[in-house]
Each structure stands twice: as C-alpha cells, then as structure tokens.
C-alpha cells in the first residue's frame, strides 16, 4: 500500500471502497496498524480516558497531543495521520491556526475538530493556510456535559436535520473528511450520500464510507463498560496482529458493523 492522502480517500469513496481507521497513541501500535492496512490513524484525545484514566477527554493538553503525534508518526509509513485538536484549543481562528500548526509540525497531516457551523471561520482559515481539516459531528465527546452524558444524537427529527445541515456547512467551509459518531444508521446513510467527501462512522451504522474504532475497544481492553458499537476482534483471533487484520477485512467487506452494533 502506498502513502495514503486525502485524494486517495476521496477516490475510495467514489469507487465504493471502504476506509478503515483506528486510533493510535504510540509508535509500536502505529506500525502494527500501518502494516496491516489501516488507511487512517487518529491520535485521539480519547487518550485522556484510555491512557490517562480520565472520565472524559476534557483534560487533555496540546502538549500531550503534540507528544503522541510525534510518537505515532515515527511508527507510520503509509497511513494518513490525523490528530485531534483538544478541548478549548480552537476557540478562535487564530488560536486554532497556532495550535494546528504545532500538530502539523509534529507530523500530523490533518487535524480534527469537534463541532458544527460555529467552526466554519476557523476551518476556512486553516484550509487557506495549508492545514487539512476533519470534522466531527453527532456525539462529540468534548461536549459531553452539554449532552448530559455519552448519548446517541440525532434520534428526533429536529436534531437529525440540524446534524445534516451542519455536515453540509462544514463541507462548504472546506473539511476533507467527516467523522459521524453515535447517530442513527438512517441519518448516517443520508449524510454519507449527500456529501462528496468521505464520511467515517463510529456507532453510525454500515452505510458510511468507512469505520473507526478506539484501539482499546477493538482489542476488548475496557474498564467494564463496553459500547454497543464496538467489537472485540482480539477475542476472535487471539492475536493482536490477526485482530487488526480481521478488523480491516470486515470493514472492507462491509460485514462490520453488523446490526447489533447500530442505533436506530
């Protein structure tokens, strides 16, 4: 597999090839995922929960995201490396640009921001200055206290229409990739068909252009609570390398996620 770019991902969408993404936080696992064909590696602020033991992602700092980006980049040859902008690091266009520049200097090739059309000015500012952007709608973990917990979004008609509208607005502002998290399958399918850019789902059903999982969930390494949309691939294979190979295969074939992993 050659080096993955946003152009490659767009072509995959156009040709109906599914995109496999997974979180990574260090060089060792980044190399494993890269070797087994993952197209996108996300340095997620989920590290605040799965690595640091926090109850949410809000305490993760820019310095920590820069550090983990450097680690992942060292283990990656082909996959597109995307890094989360942490909580309160993109309140204004100029602040967004300064922080995104740090992540790009650390080796990221795209940054991800959570939120709707209030981000459009910052997205335009980044894209004008050479920084590719991934959007994130639905359940946005940095807004967990606004939502009152980690809950499925877009189940009523008003909320679904708002998420759909915001997806179009973010695309118009310049995002090149969109993550949809914990939304009904029907809404994710509608958005995926409406957008020209690739849509990556997590808890969003099988009709998106690709899937992403937190690596700990894919290996069944949890602290007790197991999200409905996850699958323990390690339990099926008994080997980490084989587990990721199976994940990539099932995403590519469209057999993951199954009905049991979806929200209606």
From Swiss-Prot:
It is found in: Cytoplasm. GO terms for molecular function: 3-methyl-2-oxobutanoate hydroxymethyltransferase activity; magnesium ion binding. GO terms for cellular component: cytoplasm. SUPFAM superfamilies: Phosphoenolpyruvate/pyruvate domain. It is an enzyme of class 2 (transferase). Mg(2+) binds at residues 45, 84, 114. The active site is at residue 181. Homodecamer; pentamer of dimers. PANTHER family: 3-METHYL-2-OXOBUTANOATE HYDROXYMETHYLTRANSFERASE. This is 3-methyl-2-oxobutanoate hydroxymethyltransferase. It comes from Aeromonas hydrophila subsp. hydrophila (strain ATCC 7966 / DSM 30187 / BCRC 13018 / CCUG 14551 / JCM 1027 / KCTC 2358 / NCIMB 9240 / NCTC 8049).
């Amino acid at each position: 597999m050659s080096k993955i770019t946003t152009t490659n991902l767009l072509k995959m969408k156009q040709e109906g090839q599914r995109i496999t993404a997974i979180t990574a936080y260090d060089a060792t696992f980044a190399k494993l995922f890269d070797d087994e064909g993952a197209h996108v590696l996300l340095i997620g602020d989920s590290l605040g929960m799965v690595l640091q033991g926090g109850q949410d992602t809000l305490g993760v700092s820019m310095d920590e995201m820069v550090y983990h980006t450097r680690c992942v980049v060292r283990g990656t040859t082909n996959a597109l490396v995307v890094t989360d902008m942490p909580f309160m690091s993109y309140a204004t266009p100029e602040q967004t640009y300064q922080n995104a520049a740090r992540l790009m200097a650390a080796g990221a090739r795209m940054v991800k921001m959570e939120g709707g059309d209030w981000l459009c000015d910052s997205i335009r500012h980044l894209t004008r200055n050479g920084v590719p952007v991934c959007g994130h709608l639905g359940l946005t973990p940095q807004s967990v206290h606004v939502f009152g917990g980690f809950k499925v979004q877009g189940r009523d008609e008003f909320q679904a229409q708002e998420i759909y509208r915001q997806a179009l607005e973010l695309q118009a502002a310049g995002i090149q990739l969109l993550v949809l998290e914990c939304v009904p399958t029907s809404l994710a399918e509608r958005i995926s068909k409406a957008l020209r850019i690739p849509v990556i789902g997590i808890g969003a059903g099988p009709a998106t252009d690709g899937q992403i999982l937190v690596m700990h969930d894919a290996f069944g390494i949890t602290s007790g609570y197991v999200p409905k949309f996850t699958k323990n691939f390690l339990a099926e294979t008994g080997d980490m390398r084989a587990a990721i190979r199976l994940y990539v295969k099932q995403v590519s074939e469209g057999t993951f996620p199954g009905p049991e992993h979806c929200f209606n």
